[in-house]
Amino acid sequence: MKKLGNIKQIVSAYDVVFLNGAESGKNCILVHTGELEVLFNKDNALDISWVKYKGRNISFLSKNGINSVSGTFAEKFEGGFLYTCGMDNVSSCVENKPIHGSLHYRQASEVYHREENGTIVVGGKVRQTALFGSDLVLNREYTVSENGIRISDIVINEGYTADKYGLLYQINFGD
């Protein structure tokens, strides 16, 4: 590291906004850590849209790709490396909720990224609320190293009553 001109040559994070096509307007963070390239989607619960390892894609994107489309689940499902399902649809007692839940379609707030000892830390909050219903906050933080991704999720109930919730991490591998 002493002879390195700038740490961003090997470890970096950049805010990215897509400008064209169906993904136009999507806000993301693109992270490079040597062997890994990871795209975090701020507009979709800070889920991971894609991962490349040593330059090779290891995640699945559907035909829809990253998009800003409104419509049915089948019309807007992106796939992505990490697709978080929940918090209102993951349990045996839930009925009449959308497939995969609504969390993925909620924007992250208070989003940050920083370099920390050769890793990149990315985090933010995702709030799932309803009038006369839930007030749940997902505090999400990732640590991306040269060849690994660690996730830390903490759910806080900011409502006035107890609330049931669940999270399911759908990992989509592809090539």
Residue map of PLM features:
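Surface-exposed acidic/polar loop and edge beta-strand patches at domain peripheries
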Residues: M1-R150, E158-G166, Q170-D175
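Conserved kinase catalytic-core segment
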Residues: V155
